[in-house]
Amino acid sequence: MADVTIRNLNFAYEKREILKDINLSYELRDFLAIFGPNGGGKSTLLKLLLGLLRPSSGTIEIVGRSPALARAQMGYVPQFIAINKSFPISVLEVVLMGLIDKKIFGFYSKSEREQAMQALERVGMQSLAG
């Protein structure tokens, strides 16, 4: 059984079809590249996988669960974020920005900070947390 399975996935913004009949399965340790032209639906597909959007039809399963239920086990680093690049920011704060359930004004719980530190530890970057 694949860790991520997408079956007959369709998605439309209003009446504009963005993704049509997507079928895909892969194991979590596999490498996967998603590429295509601007407006081709790459970011939309990622948002569907994260449970930030709901498909018009079809199913997505991540380790046998819906994206909403699997969300706590996923991380996401957006391509663009709205920050002033000259403003000092720590590595830990950058990791916290990747939380799916973002906080207003950057107030994160102790649990969220611990979760971010664990993520940094998994990739050997805890000493850079700041």
Model features per residue range: what roles?
Residues 4-6, 18-21:
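Conserved structural motif at the start of ABC-family nucleotide-binding domains
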Residues 33, 72-79, 92, 96:
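ABC nucleotide-binding domain signature
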Residues 35-37:
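The feature captures the beta-strand-to-loop junction immediately N-terminal to the Walker
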Residues 50:
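Helix-to-loop junction immediately C-terminal to a conserved catalytic motif
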Residues 58-70, 122:
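Conserved ABC transporter NBD signature motif
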